[in-house]
A protein has these predicted regions:
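Active-site Tyr-X1-5-Lys
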Residues: 32, 50-83, 102-113
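Non-catalytic, hydrophobic alpha-helical segments
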Residues: 136, 140, 155, 166, ...
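Conserved Rossmann-fold NAD(P)-dependent oxidoreductase catalytic core, especially the SDR/UDP-sugar
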Residues: 10-52, 78
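C-terminal "lid/loop" region of Rossmann-like NAD(P)-dependent oxidoreductases
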Residues: 123, 151-153, 161-168, 175-192
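Amphipathic terminal alpha-helices
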Residues: 197-199, 210-229
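Conserved C-terminal active-site "lid" loop/helix of NAD(P)H-dependent oxidoreductases
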Residues: 133, 152, 186-212
C-alpha cells in the first residue's frame, strides 16, 4: 500500500503540473549493516533489514521515483528522511511501537503496578537521536521554501544520547522509582543517521530538547486522560 500510494500520488502531482513536492522517507531504508553514523550515500549499498524490507523498498521506490521525475520532467520534488520522531498521538502498542513510546509504556505500567525493577535488553550503549514531531513539521515547511535538489536529506537535531540515558530520562519523567536492570545477552541494534551539515546552516530556530518535548507530551497525555473521564 505504501508503494502504491507513493507512486500514485507523485504521478498525479506530476500530471497536474505540481512543481514542488516533499516526500518523507524513513531511516529504515538504510542497509542493515551500514557504517555508523549512517550517511545519505549509504542508500542501496548493501542488504536491508529483513524484518522491514518490504516497507523499506516501498519508501526507496518513492524517493527514487521523485528523483527520476526531477531528471525527466524538471520538477522540484525533494526527499526528506526524518530521524526518530516522538510526540502526541504516537503508537504505544505493547509489541508494535518504537523505542521511545515503548519505554514510556513500560515504565508507566511498572509505576502503576508497583514493579520493583524493569529489565531492558542490551547494555544501553547504542546511540539514538530524537526529533519532536512539531519540529519536523516546521523543518518540512522550511525545506519546501529553501531547499531544492534530488539528493535525500536526513532531518534531525544532530544531537544524540545513549539508550541508557534515554531510559533513565523516561523513568524520571514518568515517575518510576524502581531499579533499572540491563541484560547484555539480549540483542538490541540501533542505527544512527548522520545529519547533513547544511540542515543546521539553514534550519529555522532551535530544535526542542527532549526534556521540553517530554513536558509537552505529558501535558498532552494528561489532557487526553481528563477528556476520557
Amino acid at each position: 500500500s505504501t508503494l502504491l500510494a507513493s507512486s500514485a500520488a507523485s504521478d498525479v502531482y506530476k500530471r497536474q503540473g505540481c512543481k514542488k513536492l516533499e516526500f518523507l522517507g524513513s531511516s529504515c531504508i538504510y542497509p542493515r549493516m551500514a557504517p555508523q553514523p549512517m550517511k545519505e550515500s549509504c542508500l542501496l549499498t548493501s542488504e536491508l533489514e529483513k524484518t522491514n524490507e518490504a516497507y523499506a523498498l516501498a519508501k526507496i521506490s518513492g524517493l527514487k521515483y521523485c528523483e527520476f521525475l526531477n531528471r525527466q520532467y524538471g520538477t522540484d520534488y525533494i526527499s526528506v528522511m526524518p530521524t526518530n520522531l516522538y510526540g502526541p498521538n504516537d503508537n504505544y502498542h505493547p509489541t508494535h511501537s518504537h523505542v521511545l513510546p515503548a519505554l514510556i509504556r513500560r515504565f508507566h505500567e511498572a509505576k502503576i503496578n508497583g514493579t520493583e525493577s524493569v529489565t531492558c535488553w542490551g547494555d544501553g550503549s547504542p546511540l539514538r537521536e530524537f526529533l519532536y514531531v512539531d519540529d519536523l513539521a516546521n523543518l518540512c515547511v522550511f525545506l519546501m521554501n529553501n531547499y531544492s535538489g534530488s539528493e535525500t536529506v536526513n532531518a534531525g537535531t544532530g544531537k544524540e544520547l545513549t539508550i541508557k540515558e534515554l531510559t533513565e530520562l523516561v523513568a524520571k519523567v514518568v515517575g518510576y522509582k524502581g531499579e533499572i536492570k540491563w541484560d547484555p545477552t539480549k540483542p538490541m541494534q540501533f542505527t544512527q543517521e548522520e545529519i547533513r551539515e547544511h540542515i543546521h546552516e539553514i534550519e529555522k530556530g532551535p530544535f526542542m530538547t527532549l526534556d521540553e518535548g517530554f513536558k509537552r507530551f505529558e501535558a498532552w497525555k494528561q489532557d487526553l486522560l481528563k477528556s476520557r473521564l
